[in-house]
Amino acid sequence: MAKEELLEFPGVVKELLPNATFRVELENGHEIIAHTAGKMRKNRIRVLAGDKVQVEMTPYDLTKGRINYRFK
């Protein structure tokens, strides 16, 4: 089965939620719930409120996403 195309959007972390999840406001104004990617957890990259991040989402559920990069 082919890997589905992921949608990538820049956004800003608005709120930290329990269980290592975050409320992220995307550039287009939508708010989603996102968790950190495994490589970010492994390398202990911290994400705080106000950080600019890159979020990838699947086209099947546009309310959830994965944070795969934190901009410096």
UniProtKB/Swiss-Prot annotation:
Residues 1-72 form the S1-like domain. InterPro entries: NA-bd_OB-fold (IPR012340), RNA-binding_domain_S1_IF1 (IPR006196), S1_domain (IPR003029), TIF_IF1 (IPR004368). Transmembrane segments: none annotated. Its main location: cytoplasm. Keywords: Cytoplasm, Initiation factor, Protein biosynthesis, RNA-binding, rRNA-binding. The keyword NADP does not apply. It holds the Pfam family eIF-1a. It is found in: Cytoplasm. HAMAP family: IF_1. Belongs to the IF-1 family. PANTHER family: TRANSLATION INITIATION FACTOR IF-1, CHLOROPLASTIC. Component of the 30S ribosomal translation pre-initiation complex which assembles on the 30S ribosome in the order IF-2 and IF-3, IF-1 and N-formylmethionyl-tRNA(fMet); mRNA recruitment can occur at any time during PIC assembly. This is Translation initiation factor IF-1. It comes from Dinoroseobacter shibae (strain DSM 16493 / NCIMB 14021 / DFL 12).
